[in-house]
C-alpha cells in the first residue's frame, strides 16, 4: 500500500506518492484548483483508482514559533472534505514548516528555470511532506 503526500494551497495542490514499501517518495503532480476543492477531490478519486493508497499525509502550515497560521483552518476544512469523500482512508497531518523553502533550494540547486519553478514547487513540497512523515514513522519503530 502507498501513502499520498498532499501540499494543500489556495490555488494549487502538490501531490507525491510513496513506493509500495513506504521507503521512497516521488512527485506525482500539481493540481490547479483555484479554490474549487471538488476538482482536487475528483483528481484524488482518479488517483485512488490507479494506486492502492492507504493513508493521506497532509502538510499543516505551522509558524516557525509553533503557532497556528490562518491557513490551518483552511487546511482543516479541506481535511474534513477529504474524510467525508474517502471515509475509509485515514488522514495524517505533519508539520510542513520549511518544506517550501527546501523545495526552492532544491530547484535552485538543480538550476530549474524560474518559469518552471511555480509549476513544480508544490509537488516538491509534497515530496518533502511525505518523506518527513515516512522518516518519522521509521524512527518510531
Regions found by a protein language model. Name each.
Residues 2-3, 11-141:
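Phosphate- and other anionic-substrate recognition elements at nucleic-acid/protein interfaces
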Residues 7:
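Conserved catalytic-loop position in the HRD/HxD motif
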Amino acid at each position: 500500500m502507498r501513502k499520498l503526500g498532499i501540499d494543500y494551497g489556495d490555488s494549487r495542490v502538490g501531490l507525491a506518492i510513496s513506493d509500495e514499501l513506504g521507503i521512497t517518495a516521488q512527485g506525482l503532480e500539481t493540481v490547479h484548483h483555484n479554490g474549487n476543492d471538488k476538482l482536487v477531490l475528483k483528481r484524488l478519486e482518479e488517483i485512488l483508482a490507479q494506486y492502492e493508497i492507504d493513508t493521506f499525509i497532509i502538510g499543516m502550515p505551522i509558524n516557525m514559533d509553533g503557532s497556528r497560521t490562518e491557513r490551518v483552518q483552511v487546511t482543516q476544512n479541506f481535511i474534513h472534505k477529504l474524510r467525508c469523500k474517502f471515509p475509509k482512508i485515514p488522514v495524517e497531518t505533519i508539520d510542513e514548516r520549511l518544506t517550501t523553502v527546501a523545495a526552492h533550494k532544491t530547484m535552485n540547486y538543480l538550476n530549474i528555470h524560474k518559469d518552471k519553478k511555480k509549476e513544480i514547487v508544490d509537488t516538491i513540497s509534497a515530496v518533502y511532506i511525505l518523506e518527513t512523515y515516512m522518516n518519522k514513522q521509521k524512527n518510531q519503530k
